[in-house]
Regions:
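Conserved G/P- and acidic residue-centered "switch" motifs that form tight phosphate/ATP-binding loops
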Residues: 97
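Acetyl-CoA-dependent GNAT
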Residues: 6-85, 90-91, 103-105, 109, ...
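Extreme N-terminal starter segment of soluble prokaryotic enzymes
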Residues: 2-4
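C-terminal "cap" of GNAT-fold acetyltransferases
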Residues: 10-11, 21, 116-119, 123-163
Length: 163
């Protein structure tokens, strides 16, 4: 099966649907927000995870031969850095190189934008993501803003890009 990467608008219906699938999967992996949690912490976490469309540089879909979406990723501006966000490859499409192809698309776009590095945030309940990012050359870094206060146990990574 060939995987084709296509850049789409951030509000592309297929991209929105895949981000919804990601939200559902992350709720299963991390658990739902409980009523016991401090509402200010919940609000801070939601704000940290929110991606404003104006900050998105590129949204990519991975498609199979017949155009069926296999995965999604975004690249956003975050201060002086570019951040890989919202990578999702549904379970049925995993182990086919889709995540690798999407990660490569983000890295290539970041280079074209003149970025010095790409950063990302993930967590222990996402071991497949950690393996993918490590295989792509990302290395661990300290938790960075906007995740420090609301998600201090995040696992963060960077990929330094050669000038």
């Amino acid at each position: 099966m060939a995987v084709r990467i296509e850049e789409v608008p951030v509000d592309d219906a297929r991209a929105v649907a895949l981000r919804g699938m990601l939200d559902d999967e992350l709720t299963v992996r991390y658990g739902p927000v409980t009523t016991d949690e401090d509402p200010e912490l919940t609000a801070a976490r939601r704000a940290a995870l929110r991606v404003h469309p104006d900050d998105v540089i590129a949204t990519f879909l991975a498609l199979d031969d017949d155009g069926t979406p296999l995965g999604h990723v975004m690249l956003r501006r975050l201060g002086a850095d570019l951040e890989l966000k919202r990578l999702i490859v549904p379970a049925a499409a995993r182990r086919r190189g889709v995540g690798r192809a999407l990660t490569t698309a983000v890295i290539e776009r970041a280079r074209a934008e003149g970025a010095c590095r790409v950063v990302l945030q993930t967590g222990k309940p996402q071991p497949e993501s950690i393996a993918l990012y490590t295989a792509a050359g990302f290395t661990p870094i300290p938790v960075y803003e906007p995740y420090i206060a609301s998600m201090p146990r995040s696992l963060c990574f960077e990929l330094a890009l050669a000038p």
